Amino acid sequence: LNQKKILLRLDLNVPLSNGKITDTTRIDKILPTINFLLKNNAKIVILSHIGRPRGKVVNELSLKPICESLKNKLKKNIKFISKNIKEVNSIDLFDNYDEKIVILENLRFYEEEEKNDTEFAKHLASLADVYVNDAFSCSHRAHASTFEITKFIPSYAGLQLNLEIDALNKITSEIKKPITCIIGGSKISSKINIIKNLIPKFDNIIIVGGMANNVLKFKGHNIGKSIQEDNCDKIIEEIFSLSVKKNCKIIYPEDVTVG
């Protein structure tokens, strides 16, 4: 790793309010990986996304606040590159020998990211010597920076990604009953296969977050303007049907405030 450029894909999709980070959990979790790379004298090029700008530049979704937060936590100088990623090349990244970390702008400012565009992935790969994925929560997506890129650069799992996989292995292969799973998020459609796989293994599954709104709506409750995903009734019906067959109780909120 000595003096190698490491393209580090992280999930720094943290909540922002008026340009301020309101929860740094995702940032805190990736510090061990960054410190490990620094200890081994690597140069780090951080890739991430935040929000859903849908291929357009949205100033409120810039990674600049995340850069400032990392500076404070690591006590290191970090270079933020706001330049169009498609115009950045490897010699633009580090101005001098002492620079160790750079952060590129929000990947989702570019429609090629979510389209899993091959040329965009090739370009990202050209910026470094090695690719490290430490974004477990993004790894189910076939995007240019998580999937296609691995075809063009030596690729490895990061420390946090390995911890997440180990945790999953424990709950799927070393189960001690009775056991309950809590699952949340906003999109139930992206988690349907996970839920179906978990139902036979768990006694109870508690659905929280935005997903719970879809369940409440399915059950006939008025959810007002609360966040929900469209066209999910069939998915939820499948979940409840399978849960009955496998003797798994699906639990969802009963006492809620509707937006």
Set out the residue ranges of the language-model regions.
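Active-site loop-to-helix "anion-binding N-cap" substructures in soluble metabolic enzymes
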Residues: 1-259
